[in-house]
Design a protein with these regions (language model features):
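ADP-ribose/NAD+-binding catalytic cleft of ART/PARP-like enzymes
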Residues: 1-43
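Partner-binding and oligomerization surfaces adjacent to conserved cores of proteins
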Residues: 6-19, 92-94, 125-126, 132-133, ...
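Short, structured patches in soluble enzyme cores that scaffold and shape functional sites
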Residues: 24, 76-78, 115-117, 135-137
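Short, solvent-exposed loop/turn segments at secondary-structure junctions
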Residues: 25, 55, 79-81, 120, ...
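Short helix/loop capping segments that flank catalytic or ligand/cofactor-binding pockets
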Residues: 28-31, 57-59, 84-85, 123, ...
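ADP-ribosyltransferase catalytic core
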Residues: 38-115
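Catalytic-core elements of nucleic-acid end-processing and repair enzymes
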Residues: 69, 111, 119-122, 133
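Glycine-rich, aromatic-bearing surface loops/beta-hairpins
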Residues: 131-205
Length: 205
C-alpha cells in the first residue's frame, strides 16, 4: 500500500471525527459519565488528541503505562477539528521556512501539530507519519465546551486486541477502521500534509 508520507487517517462520519486520548481512571471515569471532560481534568494544560489508534497504542503501551490505563475514543465535530488545524503551527519549522515567521506563529497559535512515525500493532515504526494535535488556551476551551459530541471508554477493546496480539494472532480485523481524512488544500498546506507527495528526502523516519 502506497501511503502518503504525511496523511491524516481516521475514523470519521459526515459530521464527526474520532480522536484518542489515554488517562488515569480518575480523569477517564468522570469524563465518560459526564460525556465531557470535567475536573480533575485541567483546562490549563495542553492536551494532545490523536486520530491514529495505533499511535495511541504505542504511546500508552496498550493501556499499560502509568497514567494512561484508560483509553478514550472522543468524537468531535469535523468543524472543530478544522478550526484546530486552521489555527495550528507545526512544532518544528519546515525546511526553507523563515525562522522568525515560524517563531511568531508558534507563539500566537493555540494549537501545535507534529507528525510522528505511524506504528504497527507491535510498535514498529512505519515509513509514513500520523498527526498529533496539541490543544492549549482557546483551543482547549473550544474542545471541552463545543467540539466533543461523545466519549467512549474503549479500554476493554484495547485489552482484547492486546491479548490477541500476544497470542500471535493477526489483529488487523480487530482494529478500528480508518480511512484517509479529506483536507482542503489550504489546511493541508497549514499542517504540512503531503496527500499526493512522496516522502521528503530531507526528513528521516
Amino acid at each position: 500500500m502506497n501511503v502518503p508520507y504525511r496523511q491524516i487517517r481516521a475514523a470519521y462520519t459526515d459530521t464527526t471525527i474520532t480522536v484518542y486520548q489515554a488517562y488515569d481512571p480518575a480523569i477517564a471515569e468522570p469524563a465518560v459519565a459526564a460525556r465531557r471532560f470535567v475536573p480533575p481534568f485541567k483546562r490549563e494544560r495542553m492536551t494532545w488528541i490523536k486520530p491514529s489508534f495505533l499511535w495511541m497504542m504505542y504511546r500508552c503501551g496498550w493501556a499499560t503505562k502509568p497514567g494512561q490505563t484508560r483509553v478514550l475514543a472522543v468524537d468531535i465535530t469535523r468543524a472543530g477539528f478544522a478550526w484546530a488545524l486552521e489555527h495550528s503551527c507545526l512544532s518544528h519549522p519546515e525546511p526553507g521556512t523563515d525562522a522568525a515567521e515560524w517563531r511568531q506563529r508558534l507563539r500566537a497559535s493555540p494549537v501545535r501539530v507534529q507528525w510522528d512515525p505511524e506504528r504497527t500493532p507491535r510498535h514498529h515504526a512505519l515509513p509514513y507519519r500520523s498527526i498529533q494535535v496539541g490543544l492549549s488556551g482557546a483551543a482547549v476551551t473550544r474542545y471541552l465546551d463545543e467540539w466533543i459530541t461523545g466519549i467512549t471508554d474503549v479500554t476493554g477493546m484495547v485489552h482484547d486486541v492486546h491479548r490477541a496480539l500476544r497470542a500471535g494472532r493477526d489483529v488487523t480485523d480487530l482494529l478500528p477502521r480508518k480511512r484517509p481524512y479529506p483536507l482542503p488544500t489550504e489546511l493541508a498546506r497549514t499542517v504540512g500534509a503531503t496527500p499526493d507527495a512522496p516522502r521528503p528526502a530531507e526528513e528521516g523516519v
